[in-house]
Amino acid sequence: MNKWNFIESHVEQGIQALAGKNRIPELEIQTGHDVLKRHQKKLFPSAVVFGAPIKPSDCGRYNSPGGKIGVLYAADSSLTAAAEAYGRMLHLYGQINYPAGVLGQHFMCSIDVVRTVKVIDVMALCESLHIPLDSLENEDYTFTQWLMEYLYTHFGNEYDGIAYTSRHKRYKRCYAFWERPGLKAAFEDTPGGMTPYASYRETDRGMFPEWWKKTTMTGEEMFEELLNFRIIYLPE
């Protein structure tokens, strides 16, 4: 059985055919307070960071090498944002035990959406083009990085980025945003929204296990109960 192979011209033709019929799958994110979440490994001046790595080794799944596009990664859920960050750490270093001090060093950040944001749903896009969805999630970033650059180049004035499903946690969505020329900034830091995991409290009960009886979950509980990591308290 023949497998799908990434051929740029074939994907381009498919995308342009959908665009010609106004069938590019899209989603809207409405304005609001504390709409998006983002993990940061230390306290930065802002969570709204459009990173543009140059070296291929520094590029994420949707970063085009060479620093061509600044990309802001975020998620609908703190759980998904954390799963993306710590799932990569597990794959890179096999780390499942974290010293309790990490809870005070790593941050969950909240982002406000200050204008309506429109993104391309790349999962639905690939479904429409009969591109296997594992092409968006495997260890080879060639296709996803090309796709991001292509969509930005051809649709960057119409959309603010892309939406996709986390391969680490199938809960809500992840986003890779670009800066849209000619429009005001879409995102701002939620006032007081940079919180170390040590003092973070989650209220989204949709992510809690059925047996969870409390109405909130601490950052430490998220690590252990939802992400299956262990927090180790070292002797002082």
Label each residue range with its predicted role.
Residues 2-60, 91-236:
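Active-site and NAD+-binding cores of ADP-ribose-processing enzymes
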Residues 61-93:
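Extended catalytic/binding region for NAD+/ADP-ribose chemistry, centered on the ART fold
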